């Protein structure tokens, strides 16, 4: 049995320096050594007394294939000839206390289907990709100045087979991708696909960070799924959890009988609410494990982005009852983002962060954490609280709908209507809306209208597009039978039209991260709970006027100040009958009245629909947006541009 030498291990790099290809050393690799084909097993267990490899090939006898310690810092390795792909195995670890524990391989790229927990030998290097066109197109676009609509989903509960079993990665490619294309989503965001033992953890409590969960098939099957997404122009974002991991006996927890991947200090090690433990982000070997893992998913699975989970829990730790910043985590996140963007400058790194930590999406060289997007949790919480309030009382919390614009350009934001808000008794988005059946649908259409016209990229959890009535049930699939009901079909039609309008309307996304992209017309009409604003594109003539009415009242001849174009057309009204509304729409072309109003040089008079959003577009009567008197239209603005990145 041959042994890897210290040069192969790159000992100094793994233990003391940045080494982001640790998956090339550790794990189970099919190789030929001394003219014999077999598997090289390598693992880091710094406090193990002895190590061995066990599996069906030796009847799980830990006395047969003893590993050799090849570095003082605890790297163990062994080559076993004649072992083939798909062989299952674990590491048997004799602890310093004299106990023998059995662990899955932290670097395994494949694992048994739960409830079994062994690792599986698998050659991950053979998939032939067909997504060069996708890569070329992605590099031609600026992620910051493009439309972004993200469909968040849980792979196991989007849709199930008639017998209740799960679709495979390949079957989901056939089922999901046409649906996503039909709805014109630009990306899908999948809740964690790393190997995890408990279905109801939704993947957030992982045991195998390098192993795509075998619930849905092999690593090649997932590669095929991503390849097909790219073929149809869909980016793939994965939820990724570098902050904490589960305590299942076969996983990373107390890997060699002592805290190895987690902090030693119990005060900062444990997450009592989740029942997990925190990664020791101050330890070089752990950083190399995690950052190598991020690059592994990028290189082997061609992932387009990560949504980094629970960043707030990483940035702060509650030690001895006092909330303190975790400098290990701050340093780690900066190092992570630098490594990711060095690999792919067009990658999406999104922080799920509910804190007010500054400069989350600023580059590290400017003192930031280095992400390029952050979920706008403040917007989500304020807007949903406002929508859940009875309409007649909304005027008393008017500022919840305007406050977000005070900080909308402090970070690059994604507006999330995510899974977190439609589970654990929080109700579905539709059922959060107060009032009767009609009112609920009208207000959800209104919410979506405000969502798509507010600055920031968009994310919606599955089922929201057709008005899922029940909250998310993670052990079942979506209520697809709701399409049998008229109001849900109307909702679905409305959503598809709204997202199509968003994608073809540059003012709704081109300046998402610049103050020049948004201007209030009237932010202060709390008595009627009506908001009006302008969304602006790169060109002065690219402007849309948006009016939102958050009560059930209808208003005729309502004055709205507008940029001085000669005419406006209403291009979308959420109260249209084809969407299930009452039909209070503005069918005719709206002629501007040359009288200043709302700090604009002109105004129009429109019908304001109940619980409705109306989007107006200026009619460009001449090239260059000139009016009949020959002057050129300008949009009034008292703000300056501050783009990000």
Swiss-Prot record:
A Gene Ontology cellular-component term: cytosol
Subunit structure: Monomer.
Catalysis: reaction(s): Transfers a segment of a (1->4)-alpha-D-glucan chain to a primary hydroxy group in a similar glucan chain
Keyword annotations of the record: Carbohydrate metabolism, Glycogen biosynthesis, Glycogen metabolism, Glycosyltransferase, Transferase
Family matches, as PANTHER family: 1,4-ALPHA-GLUCAN-BRANCHING ENZYME
One record GO biological process: glycogen biosynthetic process
Protein's UniProt name: 1,4-alpha-glucan branching enzyme GlgB
CDD domains reported for this sequence: AmyAc_Glg_BE, E_set_GBE_prok_N
Gene of this entry: glgB
Active site per the UniProt annotation: 309, 352
Pathway(s) per entry: Glycan biosynthesis; glycogen biosynthesis
Lineage: Bacteria, Bacillati, Bacillota, Bacilli, Bacillales
Gene3D superfamilies per record: Glycosidases (3.20.20.80), Golgi alpha-mannosidase II (2.60.40.1180), Immunoglobulins (2.60.40.10)
Region (Disordered) residue spans: 619-645
């Amino acid at each position: 049995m041959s042994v890897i030498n210290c040069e192969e291990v790159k000992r100094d790099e793994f233990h003391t320096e940045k080494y982001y290809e640790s998956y090339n050393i550790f794990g189970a690799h099919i190789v030929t050594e001394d003219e014999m084909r077999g598997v090289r097993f390598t693992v880091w267990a710094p406090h193990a007394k002895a190590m061995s490899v066990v599996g069906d090939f030796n009847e799980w006898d830990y006395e047969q294939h003893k590993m050799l310690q090849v570095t003082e810092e605890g790297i163990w390795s062994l080559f076993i000839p004649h072992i083939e792909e798909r062989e299952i195995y674990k590491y048997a670890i004799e602890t310093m206390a004299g106990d023998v524990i059995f662990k899955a391989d932290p670097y395994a790229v494949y694992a048994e289907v739960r409830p079994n927990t062994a690792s599986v030998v698998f050659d991950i290097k053979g998939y032939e990709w067909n997504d060069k066109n996708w890569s070329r197109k992605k590099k031609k676009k600026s992620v910051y100045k493009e439309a972004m609509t993200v469909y968040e989903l849980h792979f196991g509960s989007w849709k199930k087979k008639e017998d209740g079993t799960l679709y495979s990665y390949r079957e989901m490619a056939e089922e999901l991708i046409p649906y996503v294309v039909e709805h014109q989503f630009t990306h899908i965001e999948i809740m964690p696909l790393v190997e995890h033992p408990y279905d109801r953890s939704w993947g957030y409590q992982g045991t195998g960070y390098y192993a795509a969960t075998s619930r849905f098939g092999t690593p090649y099957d997932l590669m095929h799924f991503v390849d097909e997404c790219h073929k149809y122009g869909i980016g793939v974002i994965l939820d990724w959890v570098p902050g904490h991991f589960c305590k299942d006996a076969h996983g990373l927890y107390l890997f060699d009988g002592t805290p190895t991947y987690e902090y030693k200090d119990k005060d900062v090690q444990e997450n009592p609410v989740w029942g997990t433990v925190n990664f020791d982000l101050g330890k070089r070997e752990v950083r190399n494990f995690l950052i190598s893992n991020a690059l592994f998913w990028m290189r082997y699975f061609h992932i387009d982005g990560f949504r980094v989970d629970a960043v707030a829990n990483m940035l702060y730790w509650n030690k001895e009852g006092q909330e303190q910043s975790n400098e290990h985590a701050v340093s780690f996140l900066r190092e992570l983002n630098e490594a990711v963007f060095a690999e792919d400058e067009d990658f999406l790194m999104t922080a799920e962060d509910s804190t007010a930590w500054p400069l989350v999406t600023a580059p590290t060289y400017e003192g930031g954490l280095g992400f390029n997007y952050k979920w706008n949790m403040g917007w989500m919480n304020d807007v949903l609280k406002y929508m859940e309030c009875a309409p007649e009382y909304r005027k008393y919390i008017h500022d919840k709908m305007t406050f977000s614009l005070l900080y909308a350009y402090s970070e690059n934001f994604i507006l999330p209507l995510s899974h977190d808000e439609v589970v654990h008794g929080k109700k579905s988005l539709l059922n959060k809306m107060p009032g009767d059946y009609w009112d609920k649908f009208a207000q959800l259409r209104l919410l979506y209208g405000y969502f798509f016209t507010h600055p920031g990229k968009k994310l919606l959890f599955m089922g929201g597009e057709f008005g899922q009535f029940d909250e998310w049930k993670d052990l079942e699939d979506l209520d697809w039978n709701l399409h049998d009901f008229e109001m849900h079909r109307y909702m679905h039609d409305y959503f598809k039209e709204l997202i199509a309008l968003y994608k073809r309307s540059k003012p709704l996304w081109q300046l998402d991260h610049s103050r020049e992209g948004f201007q209030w017309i009237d932010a202060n009409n709390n008595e009627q709970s009506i908001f009006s604003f302008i969304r602006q594109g790169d060109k002065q003539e690219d402007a849309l006027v948006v009016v939102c009415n958050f009560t059930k009242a209808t208003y005729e001849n309502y004055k709205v100040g507008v940029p001085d174009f000669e005419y406006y057309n209403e291009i979308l009204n959420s109260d249209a009958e084809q969407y299930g509304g009452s039909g209070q729409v503005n069918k005719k072309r709206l002629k501007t009245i040359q009288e200043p109003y709302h700090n604009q040089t002109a105004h129009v008079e429109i019908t304001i629909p109940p619980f409705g959003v109306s989007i107006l577009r200026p009619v460009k009567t001449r090239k260059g947006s000139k009016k009949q008197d020959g002057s050129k239209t300008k949009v009034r603005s008292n703000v300056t541009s501050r783009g990000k990145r």
